[in-house]
């Protein structure tokens, strides 16, 4: 089934019955990228100088579709890798508009504020030249192994559900109940 969003035609295989106007981002993004040839680089800096770099393309006509694609891509990166500083290379005008969107009165102010809270740094979104674009940098971090305090675990499986609780690494509660949610009516 054909659809168009911001002048980019795309195909959607299944339309939801309760919201036929809904257009998932993925088919639109795929169609958009078929028309995109202008390289753009996005760097998201997070703790300890770690930088995630994402290379993509824009159509390069500075239209609402370019802005929407860039905005969605930055939001995806913020929510998937996190960061307090976003640097974009290859589209100065769109980056300025995006900085307003992520500003204190913009539609993505919540995202910027959350990143400031998480990383304890002012959130910035800026345009940079290629010579100033940072290289990707990551570091290994040990995760898990924290046994102090109270923890609870829950697993709702297809045939049973399990609950367990520990205090300072010692199990204080465990329960497993046979449960068949797939065969139960809604």
Model region roles, listed by residue range:
Residues 60-112:
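Low-complexity, highly charged intrinsically disordered N-terminal segments
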Residues 85-87, 149-155:
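Short glycine-aspartate micro-motif
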Residues 22-23, 68-69, 143-144:
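Short, solvent-exposed secondary-structure boundary motifs
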Residues 1-26:
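Intrinsically disordered, low-structural-confidence terminal and linker regions
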Residues 98-149:
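Non-catalytic propeptide/linker segments at domain boundaries
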Residues 19, 28-32, 38-63, 156-186:
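Short glycine-rich, Thr/Ser-proximal phosphate-binding strand/loop in the N-terminal lobe
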Residues 33-36, 76-83, 145-147:
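Flexible, charged surface loops at secondary-structure boundaries
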Residues 10, 89-91, 150:
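Generic recognition of cysteine residues
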């Amino acid at each position: 089934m054909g659809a168009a969003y911001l002048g980019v035609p795309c195909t959607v295989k299944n339309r939801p019955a309760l919201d036929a106007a809904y257009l998932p981002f993925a088919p639109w993004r795929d169609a958009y990228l078929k028309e995109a040839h202008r390289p753009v680089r996005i760097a998201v800096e997070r703790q300890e100088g770690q930088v995630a770099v994402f290379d993509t393309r824009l159509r390069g006509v500075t239209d609402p579709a370019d802005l929407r694609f860039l905005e969605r891509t930055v939001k995806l990166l913020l929510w998937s890798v996190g960061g307090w500083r976003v640097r974009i290379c290859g589209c100065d005008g769109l980056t300025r508009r995006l900085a307003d969107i992520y500003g204190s009165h913009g539609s993505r102010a919540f995202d910027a504020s959350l990143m400031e809270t998480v990383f304890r740094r002012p959130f910035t979104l800026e345009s940079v030249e290629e010579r100033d674009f940072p290289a990707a940098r990551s570091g290994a971090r040990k995760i898990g192994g924290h046994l102090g305090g109270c923890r609870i675990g829950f697993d709702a499986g297809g045939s049973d559900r399990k609950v367990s609780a520990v205090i300072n690494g010692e199990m204080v509660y465990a329960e497993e109940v046979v449960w068949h949610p797939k065969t139960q009516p809604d």
